[in-house]
Amino acid sequence: MSRVKRGNVARKRRNKILRIAKGYRGGNGKLFRTANQRVMKALCNAYRDRKRRKRDFRRLWIARINAAARLNGMSYSKLMGNLKKADVRINRKMLAQLAVIDPKSFKNVVTHSQK
């Protein structure tokens, strides 16, 4: 059986990891073993936080809508219930943007939902 020399394959694999780890502090960006650990952790964090970002933005939108709704004398849950009954199909992201950018329009939405 002939000997397998992994020169090119191993070097490409290591260089790929080191390229990803470029800019990390100290040995974390220079030494393969520590860079590999840092890259694996970074990719895990990135995967987890892509899922978390969706939750975080939804929480932010709800907090903004709630604050604006209370300024108009209504709670968040009542507003959302009234919007559903009035068959107003506007999502939380758009409601939050209305509340921040154009409070008059948001007030119109609130009054429309009360009818």
UniProtKB/Swiss-Prot annotation:
Pfam families: Ribosomal_L20
Gene Ontology CC, one term: ribonucleoprotein complex
Coiled coil: none
The keyword Transport appears for this protein: no
GO molecular function list: rRNA binding; structural constituent of ribosome
Any one GO BP annotation for this protein: ribosomal large subunit assembly
Top-level taxonomic group: Bacteria
Keywords for the protein's UniProt record, in alphabetical order: Ribonucleoprotein, Ribosomal protein, RNA-binding, rRNA-binding
Keyword Ion transport found: no
Function (record text): Binds directly to 23S ribosomal RNA and is necessary for the in vitro assembly process of the 50S ribosomal subunit. It is not involved in the protein synthesizing functions of that subunit.
Classification via NCBIfam families: rplT_bact (TIGR01032)
Family per similarity comment: Belongs to the bacterial ribosomal protein bL20 family.
Protein name in the entry: Large ribosomal subunit protein bL20
Gene from which the chain derives: rplT
